[in-house]
Swiss-Prot record:
Record-level GO cellular component terms: plasma membrane
Gene that specifies this protein: lolD
Protein name (database record): Lipoprotein-releasing system ATP-binding protein LolD
Example GO BP: protein localization to outer membrane
Main location group: membrane
Recorded superkingdom: Bacteria
Protein's membrane topology: Peripheral membrane protein
Transmembrane segments: none
Amino acid sequence: MEQDAEDIPVVYLHDIKRQYTQGEATLTILDGAKLALWAGQSVALVAPSGSGKSTLLHIAGLLEHPDEGEVYVGGAATSALTDAERTQIRRTDIGFVYQSHRLLPEFTALENVMMPQMIRGLKRSETVSRAKEILAYLGLADRITHRPAELSGGEQQRVAIARAVANAPRVLFADEPTGNLDPHTADHVFQALMQLVRATRVAMLIATHNMELAGRMDRRVSLENGVVVELE
């Protein structure tokens, strides 16, 4: 009997362990961590600096390998995949937003959003249409010809969000996406992210120190002694 796609997490981390060597010491960052991310659900990852938030995001997003455990994407295990296969999943199923927008300075907002689609091999006409649609949806229709230096901090982050969802990913990871923004601008960027979750049913995991924004998300989790714990 086939399992309904709605019953399968978009991403599931199972017994993830990750250690780093520092001199003669071994630091255990993740120690049996488990986490399920579901379609259309926003999850806040709230934990102190150095607790492993970025490591968890990188492993979940297939940017880093765990020492032990398994990452499932759409119900499929990824540990045995080649680097090329992992890269393909990142291009099609996963989007990333960082604290720094990481936009290419020589390209316009439109061109930055077109880039991941062109790398994927889509026709230019398709990439232009899709990029314009997303930028307009995020309130940037009149800024598409501007380069990053000509945009405000909030506009830069919204372009970064548009780029992250350009290939219609199934999951979006954001590492302190509002960390460099003032409270008013941070709220606008957060609303843009939540708007996309509701409209596209993408699963979203945000690492954040902003407890007010975290409180407006569907779930809140933290990291304690290398494991994921649910917060009230």
